[in-house]
Amino acid sequence: VPIICGGIHPTSLPEETIKEDCFDMICLGEGEGAMEDLLQRMREKRSYTDIKNLWVKDASGHVHKNLKRPVIRPLESIPHPDKSLFVKYGALTSRIMIMTTRGCPFACTFCVNNFRNAVYSGEVYLRQRAVPDVIEELIDIKKTYKPKKFRFEDDVFAFNQKWLDDFQVAYRKHINLPFHCYVTPSTAKDEILKSLKEAGCESVSM
């Protein structure tokens, strides 16, 4: 079974990562499109050495370094994650994690998002899901897994006041569970914190 490594480590250090004997290929950047193509090629027993976003070792040890594909837009085009495997292996707790954005509006030099912006220079890496799509996923999770609270894992959850105002109304109406999220000192303004509180936010991290 081929072993693939993805995430920020191979994205930021591909040359180092692909040298590891335990990996047959690595994925740079977002993986949804690359994995879909890879599985289709494997199902059809076709070569997959030319799939964008993948670096693939062939039988001779040569590494095929493919180009990256554009970032996924809109994020609503990605199906909601299937969390049933987490239940099967006992990894789903009463506090369920979810993400509404990819990227960050800031470019702090010490942060991985600064690197992501450089990797995708020429594109805007920051994307935010529409409120109805987020609420739809939350409703499904609430109905299926009955969590006690949510944890939004966005690097910065509260930065778009208009989005937050719409989210606040919809979240209170359809979800109404406490949640945790991340903010920055520059986004922790009175109006944003008020909206978070009214939506049901019980704690934040900076």
Regions found by a protein language model. Give the residues of each.
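Glycine-rich beta-alpha loop elements in corrinoid/cobalamin-binding modules
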Residues: 1-71
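Radical SAM [4Fe-4S] cluster-binding motif and immediate context
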Residues: 76-206
